[in-house]
Amino acid sequence: MAFLWLLSCWALLGTTFGCGVPAIHPVLSGLSRIVNGEDAVPGSWPWQVSLQDKTGFHFCGGSLISEDWVVTAAHCGVRTSDVVVAGEFDQGSDEENIQVLKIAKVFKNPKFSILTVNNDITLLKLATPARFSQTVSAVCLPSADDDFPAGTLCATTGWGKTKYNANKTPDKLQQAALPLLSNAECKKSWGRRITDVMICAGASGVSSCMGDSGGPLVCQKDGAWTLVGIVSWGSRTCSTTTPAVYARVAKLIPWVQKILAAN
């Protein structure tokens, strides 16, 4: 059964820091919850943010694409009363140099449909810019014609559940390496629900899960990590043999560019 991977309470870039090149290098196992993932190296995914409500509850992930903008999933339902937390690794620690950033404006893709989960992207304009540092910087955006072929090994990160029936999410940021799938291959699991604005990955022993929604699926291009997908939906039990489905960022770039240019 298809399932959106947000957590509900009830269950253009910096000159000093180029995009997609972390100051602290990530270390990924070839097969690294996320289901069957592993703790990330602290600070090694500097664009990863946590979206939290006013009680401090983490409900979705997101990615910094500049000092002023975060990209996440439309189905996360972010509001301006929520906050973006940047520079975080361990959500159980009070020792980290985090940035808690207010949201000025929420731009949900007007073509988003909760029924089909097509166009699952929202842009967040920050009220005050993030301060880029060793542990806070932007991911690169793909161009509209970028092609990331099936079989490409990519990475996804998040504080989502490490088992679908876990009572709580992990404190430490999780990561997993996983291959991209062709949409034809993905349709073997999900049928006509898979559209050209989606990209699939996984079915390789790892999976995104509840609480990872909105976070990044990144692949390396010319030595820089590029945002290929946004965690969107998948198996209700976060099955590691079923592909996870992500919003296909390259297809959504024209809309992103339009919003950034107008704001």
Swiss-Prot record:
<feature type="disulfide bond">
    <location>
        <begin position="19"/>
        <end position="140"/>
    </location>
</feature>
<dbReference type="Pfam" id="PF00089">
    <property type="entry name" value="Trypsin"/>
</dbReference>
<feature type="signal peptide">
    <location>
        <begin position="1"/>
        <end position="18"/>
    </location>
</feature>
<feature type="active site" description="Charge relay system">
    <location>
        <position position="213"/>
    </location>
</feature>
<feature type="domain" description="Peptidase S1">
    <location>
        <begin position="34"/>
        <end position="261"/>
    </location>
</feature>
<feature type="disulfide bond">
    <location>
        <begin position="154"/>
        <end position="219"/>
    </location>
</feature>
<keyword id="KW-0720">Serine protease</keyword>
<feature type="active site" description="Charge relay system">
    <location>
        <position position="75"/>
    </location>
</feature>
<keyword id="KW-0865">Zymogen</keyword>
<keyword id="KW-1015">Disulfide bond</keyword>
<dbReference type="InterPro" id="IPR009003">
    <property type="entry name" value="Peptidase_S1_PA"/>
</dbReference>
<dbReference type="InterPro" id="IPR018114">
    <property type="entry name" value="TRYPSIN_HIS"/>
</dbReference>
<keyword id="KW-0645">Protease</keyword>
<dbReference type="InterPro" id="IPR001314">
    <property type="entry name" value="Peptidase_S1A"/>
</dbReference>
<dbReference type="GO" id="GO:0006508">
    <property type="term" value="P:proteolysis"/>
</dbReference>
<dbReference type="GO" id="GO:0004252">
    <property type="term" value="F:serine-type endopeptidase activity"/>
</dbReference>
<dbReference type="GO" id="GO:0005576">
    <property type="term" value="C:extracellular region"/>
</dbReference>
<feature type="disulfide bond">
    <location>
        <begin position="186"/>
        <end position="200"/>
    </location>
</feature>
<dbReference type="GO" id="GO:0007586">
    <property type="term" value="P:digestion"/>
</dbReference>
<keyword id="KW-0222">Digestion</keyword>
<dbReference type="InterPro" id="IPR001254">
    <property type="entry name" value="Trypsin_dom"/>
</dbReference>
<feature type="active site" description="Charge relay system">
    <location>
        <position position="120"/>
    </location>
</feature>
<keyword id="KW-0964">Secreted</keyword>
<feature type="disulfide bond">
    <location>
        <begin position="60"/>
        <end position="76"/>
    </location>
</feature>
<protein>
    <recommendedName>
        <fullName>Chymotrypsinogen B2</fullName>
        <ecNumber>3.4.21.1</ecNumber>
    </recommendedName>
</protein>
<feature type="disulfide bond">
    <location>
        <begin position="209"/>
        <end position="238"/>
    </location>
</feature>
<dbReference type="InterPro" id="IPR043504">
    <property type="entry name" value="Peptidase_S1_PA_chymotrypsin"/>
</dbReference>
<keyword id="KW-0732">Signal</keyword>
<dbReference type="InterPro" id="IPR033116">
    <property type="entry name" value="TRYPSIN_SER"/>
</dbReference>
<keyword id="KW-0378">Hydrolase</keyword>
<comment type="similarity">
    <text>Belongs to the peptidase S1 family.</text>
</comment>
